[in-house]
Structures are given as structure tokens and as C-alpha cells.
């Protein structure tokens, strides 16, 4: 079966956390700016989209805005002069309230990303109607949580997604890791030990990677690992 190549791209503390108060420190701001510039580079160089879980999408883009079937859709279309770059939302129950079918963001790495919703069978039928009305494409897959492998096959076949950035949070990263589909890991490591957050992968089993890139930038470690086959 064919699926996209997956690179998990994250900012992480020295002790492996990806969420928590440390993300609001000056050190993390520096790490984040390196992270976002790498994301822009990946977008320019052959990646077809990024995937995040509902919580991360909500914090970054929809800001907790509820969906409403009665809302008038903003059907302003993206120019179709290039292959779309997808913002893939793993949203099992269908909770994200998008205002239109693409993201507008001041960061060109995320601006004009076409939204693709991935849902489980737990989704409310009205949410599916809401997506249709807003012309937001979707995949429904998996009983309680989303079936990662099947969803990836559909992304590959129906949406032409060949390379995908996996950008958190911990839970969705863990689902991908457990499904054994993480091919590469790209990290910006903040020079801090942090507490009260979640790890890079919430679940999974031991896996071997090899270091393919390593540099130091503004006090952070920037590195890339590829899965050992």
C-alpha cells in the first residue's frame, strides 16, 4: 500500500517535552523561529502539507471558534496556480470551526494551506454537512480514533499527498509512531529542562533512527534523524 513519507517536525525541551510553559520563554521563542523557518523550507522543497491534532489546530488557527451549520460559508477560493499545500487536521469527533476552506496566516509557511479534515466514525453528521457547505474536503476513517494507515493511503490516492510534516501534538504524534509510519524526525532542541508537559510521542515502541543532520544554532540543537530500515 502506498502512503506519504512522514517527517515529524517539532520544538522540544532537552528532556523530550513538546508542550508546557517552557514554550513561552525567550529560549523557546528563538527555537520556534528556527522551527518555522525550517517549516517554510520544507514547504518550498517538496512537502505537500502538514498534519496536526485538533488541540494544536485549535491553538494555532481556529482559536476555539465553534462550528455552526447555519454560518454563511466564506467561499473565497485559493488561486489554483500551484499544487495545494494541505493543513491536515486529525479531528476525530469533528470540532474545529473553520471560517473558510484554507488558512490565512502571516507566516508564509502556513498561509494559503488548504484544509483537509480527517474524522473518525464518531463524528456528528451535521459536522460533515458543515464541511460540505464550506467546501472543506474530508476523510472519515476508524471507529473510535482515526485509522492512521488507512487515512494516509487515502491522502496519497485521493489528494496526491506524497510527503507530510507531522507537527504535533504529543497524542497525534504518538498515534503515527505507534502505527509505525514516522520515517524521519526533525527537532529543534531548546536548551532547557522543562516540567508539566507532554512528551514528543505519547505512545509507541522502541525504534532505531540514525542521525543525518546536526548543527548548533543560537544555542539550540537542530537535528534530523532517519528511521533505520
Show the residue positions of the predicted features.
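Enzymes that bind and transform nitrogen-containing heteroaromatic metabolites
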Residues: 2-229
Amino acid at each position: 500500500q502506498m502512503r506519504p513519507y512522514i517527517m515529524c517536525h517539532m520544538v522540544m525541551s532537552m528532556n523530550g517535552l513538546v508542550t508546557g510553559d517552557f514554550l513561552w520563554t525567550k529560549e523557546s521563542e528563538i527555537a520556534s523561529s528556527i522551527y518555522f523557518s525550517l517549516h517554510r523550507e520544507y514547504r518550498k522543497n517538496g512537502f505537500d502539507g502538514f498534519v496536526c491534532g485538533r488541540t494544536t489546530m485549535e491553538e494555532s488557527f481556529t482559536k476555539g471558534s465553534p462550528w455552526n451549520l447555519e454560518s454563511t460559508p466564506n467561499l473565497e477560493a485559493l488561486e489554483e496556480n500551484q499544487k495545494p499545500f494541505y493543513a491536515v487536521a486529525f479531528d476525530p469527533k469533528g470540532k474545529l470551526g473553520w471560517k473558510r476552506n484554507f488558512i490565512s496566516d502571516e507566516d508564509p509557511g502556513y498561509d494559503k494551506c488548504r484544509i483537509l479534515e480527517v474524522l473518525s466514525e464518531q463524528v456528528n453528521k451535521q459536522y460533515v454537512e458543515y464541511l460540505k457547505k464550506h467546501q472543506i474536503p474530508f476523510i472519515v476513517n476508524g471507529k473510535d480514533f482515526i485509522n492512521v494507515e488507512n487515512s494516509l493511503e487515502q491522502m496519497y490516492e485521493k489528494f496526491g499527498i506524497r510527503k507530510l510534516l507531522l507537527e504535533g501534538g504529543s497524542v497525534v504524534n504518538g498515534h503515527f509512531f505507534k502505527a509505525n509510519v514516522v520515517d524521519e524526525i526533525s527537532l529543534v532542541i531548546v536548551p532547557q529542562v522543562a516540567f508539566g508537559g507532554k512528551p514528543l510521542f505519547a505512545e509507541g515502541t522502541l525504534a532505531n533512527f540514525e542521525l543525518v543532520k546536526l548543527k548548533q544554532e543560537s544555542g539550540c540543537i537542530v537535528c534530523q534523524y532517519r528511521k533505520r530500515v
